[in-house]
Amino acid sequence: MGFLLSICKRPSQPVDVDGEPLDVVVDYDPIRVSEKGMLLEQSQSPYPALKKKKKNKEAIY
C-alpha cells in the first residue's frame, strides 16, 4: 500500500522534463479575465452575439 501511495503522491512543486523545479510565477503569466478580453473573444467568434434587451426599470402606474 505504501508503494501505491508513493506513486500517486504529487510533487510539492511542479517540475519540468529534466526534473528541475519550475518557478510558475516567473515562467507563466496568470490568466486575466477582463471585459476587453471577453469582448475580443466575442467579436472573433463565428457565432453571432445575442443582443440583450434592457428592461425598463420605471414602474408604470
Curated annotation (Swiss-Prot):
GO biological process entries: viral budding from Golgi membrane
One Pfam entry name: Herpesvir_UL11
Subcellular location: Virion tegument; Virion membrane; Host cell membrane; Host Golgi apparatus membrane
UniProt membrane topology term: Lipid-anchor
The keyword Isomerase appears for this protein: no
UniProt modification remark: Myristoylation and palmitoylation (probably on one or more of the nearby cysteines at the N-terminus) enable membrane-binding and Golgi apparatus-specific targeting and are essential for efficient packaging.
Phosphoprotein in keyword set: yes
Lipidation positions, renumbered (N-myristoyl glycine): G2
Keyword set, alphabetical order: Host cell membrane, Host Golgi apparatus, Host membrane, Lipoprotein, Membrane, Myristate, Palmitate, Phosphoprotein, Virion, Virion tegument
Binding partners and assembly: Interacts with cytoplasmic envelopment protein 2; this interaction is essential for the proper localization of each protein to the assembly complex and thus for the production of infectious virus.
Entry protein name: Cytoplasmic envelopment protein 3
Higher taxonomy: Viruses, Duplodnaviria, Heunggongvirae, Peploviricota, Herviviricetes
